[in-house]
Amino acid sequence: MVAVSSASHYFDADPSAPERRRTVRTRLAGRDVEVQTANGIFSPDGLDKGTAALFSAVPAPPARGRFLDVGAGWEPIALTLALRSPEAEVTAVEVNDRSLQLTRDNAAALGLDNLVALRPEDVPEDAEFDLIWSNPPIRIGKPALHALLERWLPRLAPGGEAWLVVQKNLGADSLLPWIGRMLEERAPGRFTAERADSVKGFRILRVVRAR
């Protein structure tokens, strides 16, 4: 995770510092693209190491389905999913208003009409997802992180998969068994959770819901 000032954090709903946008050139879904980033969000300088590790480890997304990205700044994950699977419905969930608007603007600039960026409360309660990719905001603290995962991981549709990237030294190895216990309590016998890979100090975690 990047360092942020004490006055405004990337997980605040409304960052207090005035917005300063800039254009960053990066590579998403095998394409060189230009995206808008800004201060007061996660990883404003471009693609962070954790998300890059996730991209290197996950299998290609299905061509169709309902996909979810939970909280990752200017949403390189959601943009990548929408670019790679143009017939899929991609939802980016964020609490940071600046990130939400950047995601919408970047999606529009890239012609991605299959991507919507929403606050958590605007996602229908009965919505389920075939695929979740996420670099969850570990620095929000354990209680808030657990609440976030409890809210979204059970939303996997039957046969769906979630892929998470968590830095090893930020608690990945203790988070995995907690995820397994939480899902077993919520839906006994329906979910499995495993460490799928390790990439440059990051754990890639995989959650699967049975069909």
Give the positions of each predicted feature.
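N-terminal auxiliary segments of SAM/dcSAM-dependent transferases
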Residues: M1-A29, G40, P44
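Conserved SAM-binding loop and adjacent beta-strand
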Residues: A38-S56
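Conserved SAM/SAH cofactor-binding pocket of Class I
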Residues: G50-S134
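Class I S-adenosylmethionine-dependent transferase superfamily signal
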Residues: L81, R151-W152, I179
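A short glycine-rich, Lys/Arg-flanked "PGG" loop and its adjoining helix->strand segment in the class I
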Residues: H146-P158
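Conserved beta-strand signature within the Rossmann-like core of class I S-adenosyl-L-methionine
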Residues: G159-V166
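Conserved class I S-adenosyl-L-methionine
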Residues: Q167-M182
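Core SAM-dependent methyltransferase catalytic element
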Residues: R195-R211
